């Protein structure tokens, strides 16, 4: 968290008013009690509160993680998606309040945002294994479903997908953003 390159990236994010959230570690995925310490470390580097999160590997245990996120002051989580299938894990394209399984009551503070699409879901042989044209068609179809539902389009594109070794994912991302900006 203290490298010069990361500091430059954080400065760039700040200059463009990007919101930075906590990427809950694999370790905290096994031990939710680690979430507050990870959040505090990120806040110390940023010098500002962190209220958003997503779990590594989309790994989320209920209700332990939900309770830990709430206790840590996280208000918005973006983990609700499947790695092996694009679409709406929550059955909706709209953000929803977390429901506590034990009490069946709505969380007063934690909102779950459906993850619409993760790039490796499209391309990886162990998941959907789509070619570029099929991946673009699916991404645009999902974006259209989100638009019709007045939902929230959440895309997860890993930084490694912007490298020359990522197959079609870098160009897909650029094309998808351009088409979405044009109203596709």
Task: Label the model's feature ranges.
Residues 43-146:
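Active-site-adjacent pocket scaffolds in enzyme catalytic domains
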Residues 18-20, 118-123, 156:
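Short acidic (Asp/Glu) and glycine-rich catalytic loops that position anionic groups and cofactors
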Residues 25, 113-118, 157-160:
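Short loop/turn segments at strand-loop or loop-helix junctions that form parts
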Residues 12, 16, 41-45, 68-74, ...:
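Alpha-helical structural signal in soluble globular domains
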Residues 1-60, 64, 159:
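Metal-dependent polysaccharide deacetylase catalytic core of the NodB/CE4 family, i.e.
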Residues 13-15, 136-184:
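C-terminal domain-boundary segment and adjacent tail
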Residues 31-37, 62-68, 88-93, 165-174:
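Histidine/acidic-residue-rich catalytic or RNA/ligand-binding cores of hydrolases
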